[in-house]
Amino acid sequence: EMAGAMSDVAIGTAPLRQEVHHVPSPQELDFGNRGFNLADDDNGIYVRPDIGNNILVGSTEPECDPLHWVDANHEGQIQPEQWEAQVLRLNRRLPAVGVPHQRKGVVGVYDVADDWIPIYDKTCVSGFYVAIGTSGNQFKNAGIAGHCMAELIMAVENGHDHDSDPVQVTGPHTKLNIDMGNFRRTRTVNPNSSMSVHG
């Protein structure tokens, strides 16, 4: 904003408070080695393995959970109600987890775009690029997001007019086309978005 680079950005972003909780995996489950990322929309959570045979459990923003929009500099503590809700939801899928005596986890702030789809684009200021509005869902896409941004930057710096002819990137592993126009700053809100961490 200080450089005036955001003057033509049509999609807004806002800070959203999030909690991800950390619980020990039952030894017999060996989630640290055999676990996988799982989105459980029936229970409103996602889980993924963490080091030391632990489980990370976060929210998929079910309708019953209010969203907590905060100041960008927000710092917070784990809220007992949120911790209990997510751990009990995890127990519906994995009853052997139980309810740990100690609450552990992290509190952070997601940078959420209006349609929960990130903005990967150039700006109206030459040499300024943005990768913003990535919500919480882009931690798993960091590698390909970096690749796409590098391709976009190289194309624009070499004279490509991304605004009138969106850069097309080929996925390095899938060889599928990625239309960078889907992530541009001047798009309208995508009505087909899940409007959630799923993107």
Where are these regions (language model features)?
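Active-site substrate-recognition segment that forms the wall
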Residues: 1-126
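C-terminal lid/capping helical subdomain adjacent to the catalytic/cofactor pocket in oxidative enzymes
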Residues: 124-199
